[in-house]
């Protein structure tokens, strides 16, 4: 089970979050739910493009990046643990960007696999390595993966990072008005702008048909009286048409309900993940009826078990929280006053006491994650 580690990053002072199965993260406004997703997104982008570009593109620069309670000499840390592997980077800000001479370490138990210090010195399994300037701006983990593909330990961590996907702020309006660009079919965009292109690709490729079927069957389950299939029109852009039960004339997606389009997006986000991956979705409850929210969680759990996925939802929804009444250990709370966050709900409140209520009811009544406690 992987664990996300964050220190002194925006609203997060110290975070240590074991990730697995389907979980929800909740908290009062401003406690750092979206920041957790940004941490995952920065890690993923840094592996692809290097840390300076990841911070610039994902966060708009490093201004105000350090937690306000952290001292000036305290580093910002992002990291992941996987079994006995531990990887982390320490960010050193300089102006509006992040210095590429960042400290980075990968260890296995008590053994150091590689370390790069703040001066740029790089040591891999006890031997000093001279990196060309282009490689020096990359993560050390990326360098080891490319130049030592036989290193199984580095490969395990790299595969974990490669399979992180973060989704937020879906562009429903853009999809209605413009559809998806036909050429963008490599992976699902963070805001889902190419979701129709990806769905058409999945439908037409035998190896990806299961992904399309997951979305299609999920929509049928969530909207039994509204949805009876989907088709696509393609040119330079891909648009969609939705069939209703008993009607052979499809509706253009521009006329479809927000809830249907939102659910389609959410199911596609889950389906896009590869086996063993991590999918993080910000506040999926928007535009969804409670019945659809329940079907979403049901489908997410089944897909997670089948494909060994970690699916993370951030939420303010009592309905979504209620789907975890029997699993309070999968509800994590960014609760003020705790040194290490998030706190598992069954550790924050007695499990026997929790059994007397619904989690959503307790959330509404401010028994945890209360805005008034900020």
Regions found by a protein language model. Give the residues of each.
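The start of beta-strands in P-loop NTPase/AAA+ ATPase cores
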Residues: 2, 277-278
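Conserved P-loop NTP-binding catalytic core
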Residues: 38-100
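Phosphate-binding glycine-rich loops of NTP-binding sites
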Residues: 21-60, 257, 262-269, 299, ...
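Phosphate-binding P-loop
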Residues: 14-20, 271-273
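C-terminal lobe/lid and adjacent interdomain/linker elements of RecA-like ASCE P-loop ATPase modules
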Residues: 295-374
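N-terminal pre-Walker A segment at the start of P-loop NTPase domains
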Residues: 1-13
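Electropositive, glycine-dotted interaction segments
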Residues: 85-217, 221, 225
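Conserved ABC ATPase signature
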Residues: 212, 220-224, 228-271, 278-291
